[in-house]
Each structure stands twice: as C-alpha cells, then as structure tokens.
Swiss-Prot record:
Skewed-composition ranges (Basic residues): 199-211
Protein's cellular compartments: Membrane
GO cellular component, one term: membrane
Keywords, alphabetical: Membrane, Transmembrane, Transmembrane helix
Topology in membrane: Single-pass membrane protein
Protein species of origin: Dictyostelium discoideum
Phylogenetic lineage: Eukaryota, Amoebozoa, Evosea, Eumycetozoa, Dictyostelia
The protein, known as: Uncharacterized transmembrane protein DDB_G0285607
Compositionally biased tracts (Low complexity): 150-198
Transmembrane segments: 225-245
Region annotated Disordered, chain positions: 53-75, 150-211
Length: 361
C-alpha cells in the first residue's frame, strides 16, 4: 500500500481490515453484499488541498473516486478547497465501490482505530462510520458496530418519511456523481446537492464553515456598527451637556442650589451704606441673637477709642458688644440679606427682620 500523499496525513495511517478477516453481518440489507477490502485513511487537514490522483488506488474504476471520498470534491478527482476543513475520510484500495456506500458495515471487522478530534463542533462524523468518533483520543473497536446500531442513511434530508434510506437505489458507479437519495444527477463541481453518506460529513462541514464564517462576518459588522452608533450617541450627549453648561452656566446654578444662596457673589455698592459701613470692623463671632436695634448707652464714650458702628440708621458701640475686631468684607446680598465673610463664617444681616444670624460656611 503506497500512499504517496503521506505528507498530507497529519495524524496517522492505518488499516482497518486485515485480508480475509470478515464477520458475517447480523443484519443483512435487501441486496446481498460481497466481501470488500477497504482501507480507511484518516486525513487531518492542515490547510492544504489533497489530490486523489496522488493516492494509490488499486481499483480499476478510477471514476468512482468521487463517490468514495468523505469530502467536497469535483469531477476532476480533486478535493475542493479544504482550508476550513479539519478532517476528512479517504477510502481507497477496495473492491466493489458500490458496497462502500451501503449503510450496513456489520460485515466489517474493525480492529481498532484511534482518532483525535481537534474540534468539538461535531460530535459525530456524518459518514458511513457515523457514531465511530464521539470524543477526543478515544479508542473504538468493532463493538461499536453492532446490529443494534442504526446504519441507515443518516443524511437523508428530503423530508420523505416513506423513503427507503438504504441507498440501495444509488448508482454509485455513475461518473456524474448521483449523490442524492432521489438519484438526481449532481453536475455541480462543488457538490451543492445533498450528498450521500460518504461525502456528507465533508460537505456538511464545508457548508457549516461557509455558513458560520458568513454569519460571523455579518455579526462582526453588526457589532462594529452598533459600537460606532453607541459611541456617536455618547459623544452627542456629552456635547449637548457641554453646550448647556456653557450657555446657561449650569455649574454656577448647581452650586447655588447646593449651597443655597451663600455662594452667590454680588458686589455691594458702597454708596448704599456709606464708607463707614464698608470700612467697619466686626468681631470674629457675632452674638447669635443680636438685635440690630440694640444700642450702646454710653453715647460713644468708649475707652477703646473704637468708632461707633452705624448700620441702618442705628448706632452701637463696638467694644461694648464685640470683644475682638477683625476686618470682614461684604460679599453679596440677596433680597436685602447681606453677607459678611470673616474666616469661615458667613454673617447674614437681614434688615427686614433686623436680626444678625451666624451662618457656618
């Protein structure tokens, strides 16, 4: 057995049968089966194309190669593009190619086969050996091919429940690759028609990857569009907020709301109160319940020499009412309420209720 394409085999080459080692089928198909001598060769694709012409084939009928490959093939005895196919089956060195497509393999005594499945996308290979591969690096033997296993055509997709799926009606020696259970000719080089058992896995895998890649690209485009739209929306919202802040000075308004009225800066015109008021000296701490009508009775005769403070037409002595004098500045007024800043305190003087109130900043 000379496999000239051994370089393309990345996993192993093995013989599944020894000559003259057969087991009589426990369940016979409708048509008699002659003993066959297939050799199963597992090819794990490594992004290459495999050519059936390079594989030794002792079958005199070379036109049947396309019917015996679990893969996407064309009429030039050449596998199609397998860049996205991870594995495929090649069946060669056999007698009676029409027997290979028969779904009953109870007549074959399989010694053992070790198969490493690189992808868990497919738990079973949809070829005639369907059910053989179920997990990674698992040893399978002839016990997997018992009479209890349903070896009917698993790839019948014609939705005809009354159709016999044993592929007994397929003309597998036809060069036109009648790969459908309905005996329709497949003249498409890419085998777009529904394939039979032996090419179904490769076709299904190939179709799956094209479908998967197609939708993967669509999903990628959709995700990029979605991300772009969301980014644009966020930038637009930020721009609107920035314009509102710039136009309406929302920061200042928010500060005023948070700190009530005490952060509003408005210059008090000195002409309203006179120079004495703006240059007056106030104590660090005002008496909380100081009434502005409270007057100093010593008629300005104070030993400290401090000038009487005149506010709102009333006058009172600074020393008798205040212990320490420090300069404070008028920082603003709102609705006749005046604020005097001294250290960390705001002093509110309301001429309507005539009370001086201590406010902590």
């Amino acid at each position: 057995m000379d496999f000239t394409s051994s370089k393309s085999v990345s996993l192993f080459e093995t013989s599944l049968l020894k000559e003259n080692q057969f087991q009589q089928p426990q369940q016979q198909p409708s048509s008699p089966i002659k003993p066959i001598k297939p050799i199963l060769k597992l090819v794990v694709n490594s992004n290459k194309k495999y050519n059936n012409k390079n594989i030794s084939n002792n079958n005199n009928n070379n036109n049947n190669n396309n019917n015996n490959v679990c893969g996407n093939i064309n009429n030039n005895n050449e596998l199609g593009d397998q860049s996205d196919i991870e594995r495929s089956f090649l069946i060669n060195n056999f007698e009676g190619s029409d027997q290979l497509t028969n779904p009953y393999y109870n007549s074959i005594d399989i010694e053992s086969i070790i198969i490493e499945v690189y992808s868990n996308q497919f738990s079973k290979l949809n070829c005639d050996f369907q059910g053989l591969i179920s997990s990674k690096s698992k040893i399978l033997n002839s016990n997997n091919f018992s009479s209890d296993y349903n070896y009917n055509n698993y790839n019948n997709n014609n939705n005809n429940n009354n159709n016999n799926n044993n592929n007994n009606n397929n003309n597998n020696n036809n060069n036109n690759n009648n790969n459908n259970n309905n005996n329709n000719k497949n003249n498409n080089k890419n085998n777009n028609n529904k394939p039979n058992n032996f090419i179904h896995h490769h076709h299904h895998h190939h179709h799956y990857h094209h479908y998967h890649n197609h939708h993967k690209v669509e999903n990628l485009i959709d995700s990029h569009i979605f991300i772009g739209l969301m980014a644009f929306l966020i930038l637009f919202i930020l721009m609107v907020i920035g314009l509102l802040i710039y136009k309406y000075n929302l920061k200042k308004r928010v500060l005023i709301l948070l700190e009530k009225r005490y952060q509003r800066k408005k210059k008090v015109k000195t002409s309203q109160f006179g120079d004495d008021f703006t240059s007056a000296k106030f104590s660090q701490v005002f008496p909380k319940n100081l009434n502005i009508n409270q007057k100093n009775k010593d008629d300005g005769d104070d030993s400290s020499g401090a000038d009487d403070l005149s506010v709102g037409g009333e006058s009172f002595d600074g020393e008798s009412d205040f212990e320490h004098f420090k300069e404070v500045q008028v920082v603003g007024d709102i609705d006749n309420v005046f604020f005097f800043k001294n250290n960390n305190y705001y002093y509110e003087e309301n001429f309507d209720n005539e009370n001086l109130i201590n406010k902590e900043f």
